[in-house]
C-alpha cells in the first residue's frame, strides 16, 4: 500500500531539534525530490538536485505521500510561502508548476523579442507555462490545443495566437511564422501525434522541448543534421527554480487554475480527473 501525493504544501506541525530557520506554523511548499545522500552527491552539489543520487518522491517510491493530514520530509526540501499566498494556492507548483517553469526558463534563454514560441497543450502544465513565458520574455506565444474550451480559457493568460487542432494546425502555425515555423516549440502532450506535429512546427535551428510523454519521437538523422533542430527533454525543476517560481507567484505573475476538494473527497477528485472534468489542477484540502 502507498499513500499518493507528491505535490505538497502546508503548515509545519513540528521540527527536529537540529532544524534552524523553520518553526511550527510556518507555511511551506515542498520540493518533491528527496536526496538519498542528504544533498552531498555531485548532482546536488552542482545544484542539479532533480538528478540527486538515490532520489525519491513522496507518494511514489516513498510510501508516505501528501494525501494525508501529516507528512514527514527533509528540511532541505522546504521553501517558505510568501505571506500573500496560502498552501492551497501553490501546492501544484511543486511539480506541475515547477516543470512548466523549468521548460519556460530554458526556452526564454534563447527567445528574442518578436520571435515565436508554440505551446502544445494548455491544460494543467500548459496554462502555467504560458504565464511563465509571458512574464519572462517578449516572444509571441502561439497556443495549440485540441479543446476549444481549453483554448478559450488559456488565451487570456498570455496567448498571442490560438490554433485549434483540426488537421490544419501545422499549416496555421507556419502562416503565423511567415512560413518558417517557431523558434521554440513546447510539447506538453507527447503522444497521439503531437511529437511529429511539434517537430514540423519547429523552425530550422529552433528547439523542440518535450515535456509530456507516451510515444516515440521519430525523426531521420539526416533531417536533424540538415535542419539543425534541437530536441530537449524536461524533468522537474530544481529547488532554486521552485524558489524563483514562488517569486513570480508572489508578484501575481503566475496563477493556478484549480478545483478544490476536501481530503475525504480524494476518490471523487481522481474520478473527475480521469473523466476530464478538472480544469487546471485538483487540490486536496485537509
Whereabouts are the PLM-identified features?
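Residue-level marker of beta-strand positions
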Residues: 7-9, 27, 43, 70, ...
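Cysteine-cluster motifs in flexible loop/terminal segments that predominantly coordinate metals
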Residues: 21, 32-79, 83
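Mid-domain Rossmann-like dinucleotide-binding core that forms the NAD(H)/NADP(H) cofactor-binding site
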Residues: 76-78, 83-167, 171-172
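Glycine-rich cofactor phosphate-binding loops and adjacent beta1-alpha1 units
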Residues: 108-113, 136, 151-230
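C-terminal hydrophobic helical "lid"/dimerization subdomain
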Residues: 143, 148, 196-200, 239-286
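Rossmann-fold dehydrogenase core element
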Residues: 207-209, 219-259
Amino acid at each position: 500500500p502507498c499513500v499518493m501525493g507528491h505535490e505538497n504544501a502546508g503548515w509545519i506541525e513540528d521540527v527536529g531539534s537540529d532544524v534552524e530557520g523553520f518553526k511550527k506554523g510556518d507555511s511551506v511548499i515542498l520540493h518533491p525530490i528527496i536526496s538519498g545522500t542528504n544533498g552531498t552527491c555531485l548532482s546536488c552539489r552542482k545544484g542539479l538536485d532533480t538528478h540527486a543520487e538515490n532520489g525519491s518522491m513522496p507518494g511514489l517510491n516513498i510510501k508516505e505521500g501528501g494525501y494525508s493530514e501529516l507528512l514527514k520530509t527533509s528540511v532541505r526540501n522546504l521553501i517558505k510561502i510568501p505571506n500573500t499566498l496560502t498552501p492551497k494556492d501553490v501546492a501544484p507548483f511543486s511539480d506541475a508548476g515547477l516543470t512548466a517553469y523549468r521548460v519556460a526558463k530554458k526556452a526564454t534563454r534563447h527567445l528574442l523579442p518578436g520571435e515565436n514560441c508554440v505551446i502544445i497543450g494548455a491544460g494543467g502544465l500548459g496554462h502555467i507555462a504560458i504565464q511563465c513565458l509571458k512574464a519572462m520574455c517578449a516572444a509571441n506565444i502561439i497556443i495549440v490545443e485540441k479543446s476549444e474550451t481549453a483554448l478559450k480559457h488559456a488565451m487570456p493568460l498570455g496567448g498571442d495566437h490560438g490554433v485549434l487542432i483540426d488537421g490544419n494546425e501545422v499549416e496555421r502555425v507556419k502562416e503565423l511564422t511567415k512560413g518558417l515555423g517557431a523558434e521554440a516549440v513546447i510539447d506538453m502532450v507527447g503522444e497521439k501525434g503531437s511529437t511529429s506535429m511539434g517537430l514540423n512546427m519547429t523552425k530550422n535551428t529552433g528547439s523542440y522541448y518535450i515535456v509530456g510523454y507516451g510515444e516515440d519521437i521519430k525523426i531521420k538523422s539526416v533531417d536533424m543534421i540538415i535542419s539543425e533542430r534541437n530536441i530537449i527533454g524536461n524533468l522537474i525543476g530544481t529547488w532554486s527554480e521552485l524558489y524563483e517560481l514562488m517569486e513570480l507567484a508572489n508578484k501575481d505573475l503566475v496563477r493556478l487554475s484549480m478545483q478544490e476538494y476536501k481530503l475525504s473527497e480524494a476518490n471523487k477528485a481522481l474520478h473527475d480527473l480521469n473523466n476530464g472534468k478538472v480544469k487546471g489542477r485538483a487540490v486536496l484540502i485537509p
